[in-house]
Amino acid sequence: MVTITSWKRFKEYLYYDQELGLLLDISRMNFSAEFLRSMAEPMREAYHQLQLLEKGALANPDEGRMVGHYWLRNPDLAPTEEIVQDIKETLKEILDFAEQIHSGRLQGEKGNPFRNILLVGVGGSILGPRFVADALASSRDKMKAFFIDNGDPDGIDRVLSRIGEELPATLCLIISKSGGTIETRNGMLEVRRAYKEAGLSFPDHAVAITQRGSQLDKLSQKEGWLRAFPMWDWVGGRTSLLSAVGLLSLALQGIDVAGLLQGAKDCDGRTRRPDTLDNPGALLALMWYYSTQGQGGKQMVVLPYKDRLELFTKYLQQLIMESLGKEKNLQGETVHQGITVYGNKGSSDQHSYLQQLLEGPDNFFVTFIEVLKDRQGPSTYMEENSTSGEYLQAFLLGTREALTQKGRESLTITVKEVNAYTIGVLIALFERAVSIYALLVGINAYHQPAVEMGKKAAGQAIQLKNNIVEFLKSHPGKKFSVSELALAIQEEEHQEMVFKLLLHLTTNPEHGVNMEPGEPWPESRFFVGGPIS
């Protein structure tokens, strides 16, 4: 158990803020006092760069834009009066719109009060809202939230099936910054079809959250959607939770968005302090830097011991990995930076991969997230004069102790309870840590060039699929092997992709592509229409 030495170290390095309701224990990371001294100057430079960023310095040179998600919870920090007023007015419009929906002054086309929200988006545009909606859900919610966040047709059908006859009472939020994101566009078209088949007008149930002047914004204006709320070029998707992207759906659900914003604002204030030991965001980033030694490849296991925080790991996975996973640094040098984030929740994870954490490769550190308040109201005693919440804490403490005994590092974040304020604190804490770590290792945390590569390759795959279908339809009944087909459409170097596309085409009925199985399987032959005898 804890020794006198570890107790002394715990007290020396514990960050505690009673107003935030936040404790950060870094004592089980094996850094030395010399490490902290050696990082004093790099940290001072990081603080300086962050000050410039918050004042509107160009933070994303690739896209020529500022990065201002910190302004969302404190608009008066924004560098221009136009931005200040835009943030404040948008928040007021969000709250006014939510009040109109809740009061019934704004209803669906057939006089149905809106009781549900359907969010359609992808990535950062929906991970954050989904996390907070789940974390703060209660029996007092004013509306029920549903999410379409993937291009899976069956997944979309499942969501629409759960909504069922409530579709006339469902408000649909389409979230896309550019308005051209394929997954979101496809989700919107699928949902539009569902409204049409139900005899409903999609525009009478639709709200756009997008950049002004985007394709989506123009469509919403042309069709007369209920409303359009802005996204700004200085807010990236993964840091957009406290913009209209998250605040609109959360306000509609009935969540305390003022508390959410206040928690983030208050935490931001603490993470601007120049004293690293009194700055929780800096301490967190510094521990990441210590663990990775400023290099890529380390793994962060996130273990929140609270069901309400189960989706927090997925949210952090995108925030951290998309921000920090970079091939090049700001000087254009190849560095392959990144921290791999995974996890689910405790104590479930103790029965899945804890075995490897204790006895497998030592290539990770654990971030425990502890919530002190077990539930609303008293608990029943189980055994050993203990409640289920006391057992849960014991599992956390026991796992942490076992890791320490094996020489495996961990840090622990503790909050008093899960509410809107503490969720805001946690969001701001990790956003700041990401910014500071990126400055320490000299990378751009605010772009995602590799994601664009994937989108481009996906577009090429769609074009190849269309070429395959067009060729087969122009030769009805004639059978082709993969090699013959690839040669005919001049795609010989992509035979594997041709085969994969054909397997999907033959499994689904839309294009009428058939397969004559071969031996081995890749030697199958493919055709459209009845085979030529």
From Swiss-Prot:
Is this entry keyworded Cytoplasm? yes
Q: Which terms does the UniProt entry file under GO BP?
A: gluconeogenesis; glucose 6-phosphate metabolic process; glycolytic process
Q: Where in the cell is it found?
A: Cytoplasm
Q: Which UniProt keyword terms apply here?
A: Cytoplasm, Gluconeogenesis, Glycolysis, Isomerase
* Pathway in which the depicted protein is active: Carbohydrate biosynthesis; gluconeogenesis; Carbohydrate degradation; glycolysis; D-glyceraldehyde 3-phosphate and glycerone phosphate from D-glucose: step 2/4
Question: Which GO molecular-function terms appear in the entry?
Answer: carbohydrate derivative binding; glucose-6-phosphate isomerase activity; monosaccharide binding
Q: Which GO terms describe its cellular component?
A: cytosol
Give the EC number(s) listed in the UniProt record. 5.3.1.9
Name the chemical reaction catalysed here.
alpha-D-glucose 6-phosphate = beta-D-fructose 6-phosphate
Catalytic residue positions = E322 (proton donor), H351, K455
Where are the membrane-spanning stretches? none
**SUPFAM superfamilies in the record:** SIS domain
Alphabetized PROSITE patterns for the sequence: P_GLUCOSE_ISOMERASE_2, P_GLUCOSE_ISOMERASE_3
Q: Which InterPro entries match?
A: G6P_Isomerase (IPR001672), Phosphoglucose_isomerase_CS (IPR018189), SIS_dom_sf (IPR046348), SIS_PGI_1 (IPR035476), SIS_PGI_2 (IPR035482)
Does Cytoplasm show up as a keyword for this record?
yes
Q: Give the function comment from the record.
A: Catalyzes the reversible isomerization of glucose-6-phosphate to fructose-6-phosphate.
Q: Which family does it belong to?
A: Belongs to the GPI family.
- This protein is called Glucose-6-phosphate isomerase
